[in-house]
């Protein structure tokens, strides 16, 4: 279970690392505004939310692992697009692609599949803790590598 929590935490670290630095760099993108900053931050959650159920259903059909691996690859692709973006549009597209790598529901389903009922609460709490740890680490590491 620790490996799944680490996997989820690593993915969340990629999401959270941009939070403390994106506003600082918005002047580097022509025409970037507070509105576009909000869209850039929010588009990730929008695409993730829109794809949780379809990807969860897909994982019921083809298995959890292929969807998780595919989601991580999509997330990496989105990260590369966002990191190489020279315009606010490119940055927003990259963040949307990152969100399309939605694995949260599939990962939780895999945890549920792999744990007994008496250990499920502990497993879910471990994943929840990984989210908090990722957020804390991202607030420190993000600005250091920027």
Regions found by a protein language model. Give the residues of each.
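Cytoplasmic helix-loop-helix junction between adjacent transmembrane helices
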Residues: 94-130
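Residue-level signature of mid-helix packing/kink "hotspots" within the transmembrane helices
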Residues: 45-53, 135-136
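Juxtamembrane helix-start elements in MFS-like secondary transporters
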Residues: 32-41, 124
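Short amphipathic helix-loop junctions that connect adjacent transmembrane helices
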Residues: 20-35
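Small-residue (Gly/Pro/Ala) motifs that create kinks and tight helix-helix packing interfaces
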Residues: 23, 134-146
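Conserved MFS/SLC helix-loop-helix module at the cytosolic interface between two early adjacent transmembrane helices
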Residues: 50-86
């Amino acid at each position: 279970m620790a490996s799944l929590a680490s996997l989820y935490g690593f993915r969340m670290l990629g999401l959270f690392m941009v939070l403390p630095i994106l506003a600082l760099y918005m002047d580097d993108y022509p025409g970037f505004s507070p509105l576009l900053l909000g869209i850039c931050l929010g588009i990730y959650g929008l695409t993730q939310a829109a794809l949780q159920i379809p990807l969860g259903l897909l994982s019921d059909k083809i298995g959890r692992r292929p969807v998780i691996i595919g989601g991580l690859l999509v997330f990496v692709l989105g990260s590369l697009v966002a990191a190489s973006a020279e315009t606010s549009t490119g940055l927003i597209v990259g963040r949307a692609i990152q969100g399309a790598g939605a694995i949260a529901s599939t990962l939780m389903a895999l945890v549920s599949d792999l744990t007994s009922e008496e250990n499920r609460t502990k497993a879910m709490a471990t994943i929840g803790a990984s989210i908090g740890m990722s957020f804390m680490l991202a607030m420190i590491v993000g600005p250091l590598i920027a």
